[in-house]
UniProtKB/Swiss-Prot annotation:
Residues 315-325 have a biased composition (Acidic residues). Mn(2+) binds at residues 145, 212, 225. CRISPR (clustered regularly interspaced short palindromic repeat), is an adaptive immune system that provides protection against mobile genetic elements (viruses, transposable elements and conjugative plasmids). CRISPR clusters contain spacers, sequences complementary to antecedent mobile elements, and target invading nucleic acids. CRISPR clusters are transcribed and processed into CRISPR RNA (crRNA). Acts as a dsDNA endonuclease. Involved in the integration of spacer DNA into the CRISPR cassette. This is CRISPR-associated endonuclease Cas1 2. One of its GO terms (molecular function) is DNA endonuclease activity. Disulfide bonds: none annotated. Pfam families: Cas_Cas1. The gene is cas1-2. It comes from the Bacteria. GO terms for biological process: defense response to virus; maintenance of CRISPR repeat elements.
Length: 325
């Protein structure tokens, strides 16, 4: 491995948003170096700060030392194991104590029928380039969404010359589908991986879906569907127009390039945060986020009480005065 003196110093990290930076690494060895992490690859050693790093994505061909993982955890950095270009999400390791505030907001919106419907309508509205008319029912919006999707397929079929006979694939016989359907399915898996990574990294649950339900990745499907018409559909049709060979591999490459150029990961993060704003849910600062070592609160009928406190006196039945909520 090259000496540290020849290292590049990665001072500027890409960000989901202000305060949460991320780094994607593949075909490299990650070690603890000089108070941060060192990334050894074919180009040499790159030093990356840890204090400002929110998420480290480890792609194919990556190894990481125990010392590096420990340092990342101590600094509150999430480590995620993903596929090439974040095409799939495999596992994660959470650094230090993380706030559950965003998950709570998602869960409250999911459990309240009125808020649930509002989030569903927001998700549908985000798919359209023009504002939807006021007063539409959910059934009417679903109908408009179906028309939008069919129009997207028809448009790219015309522009690329690739015949389109409808969305069709057989889970038991992958090769039975035509090339463009295989490209769409392979590309969708890529998009799901990216959405999964964004959701988990920001502290939301992939299981609590609003439009989609019943699956552990329901919310992943909700979010990925926002970007299919802009990214997946054109990439699939263009890939097949170039050649019908190896469309699965080539569409993933095309999607990766389009996603990087369009900074889609950052856009996903902003869309996720905006989705739950303005719902009348508490917006106050979360003390756990400010101090990750601070104990969480304890549930109580009157609200939350302070955690990390020994309640109860020396005598049976004697209780210490509980601190104010």
């Amino acid at each position: 491995m090259p000496p540290v003196s020849s290292a590049r110093n990665l001072k500027e990290l890409p960000k989901f948003r202000d305060g949460l930076s991320y780094l994607y690494v593949e075909h490299a060895v990650v070690e603890r170096e000089a108070g941060g992490i060192g990334i050894y690859d074919q180009e040499g050693l790159t030093l990356a700060p840890v204090a400002g790093l929110g998420v480290l994505f480890l792609g194919p061909g990556t190894r990481i030392t125990h010392a590096a993982v420990r340092l990342l955890a101590e600094n509150g950095c999430t480590v995620a194991w993903v596929g090439e270009g974040m095409a799939r999400f495999y596992a994660q390791g959470l650094g230090d104590t993380r706030s559950a505030a965003r998950f709570y907001r998602q869960a409250r919106a999911w459990a309240d029928p009125a808020l649930h419907l509002e989030v569903v309508m927001r998700l549908y509205r985000m798919r359209f380039s023009e504002p939807l008319p006021e007063g539409l029912t959910l059934e009417q919006v679903r109908g408009l969404e179906g028309v939008r999707v069919r129009n997207a397929y028809a448009r790219w079929s015309r522009e690329t010359g690739v015949p389109w006979y409808g969305r069709s694939y057989d889970r038991g016989n992958w090769r039975a589908a035509d090339p463009v359907n295989r490209a769409l399915s392979a590309g969708a898996s890529y998009l799901y991986g990216l959405a999964h990574a964004a959701i988990v990294s920001l502290g939301f649950s992939p299981a609590l879906g609003f439009i989609h339900t019943g699956k552990l990745l329901s919310f992943v499907y909700d979010i990925a569907d926002l970007y299919k018409a802009d990214y997946l559909v054109p990439a699939a049709f263009r890939t097949v127009a170039e050649s019908e060979e190896a469309v699965e591999r080539r569409v993933r490459r095309a999607l990766r390039e389009a996603i990087q150029e369009g900074r889609l990961l950052e856009r996903m993060a902003e869309d996720l945060l905006n989705l739950f704003r303005g719902l009348g849910l508490p917006e106050e600062e979360d003390p756990v986020e400010e101090d990750p070592t601070r104990p969480g609160g304890l549930w109580d009928l009157e609200g939350e009480v302070e955690g990390g406190v020994a309640y109860g006196g020396d005598d049976p039945g004697e209780g210490a005065e509980e601190p104010e909520g």
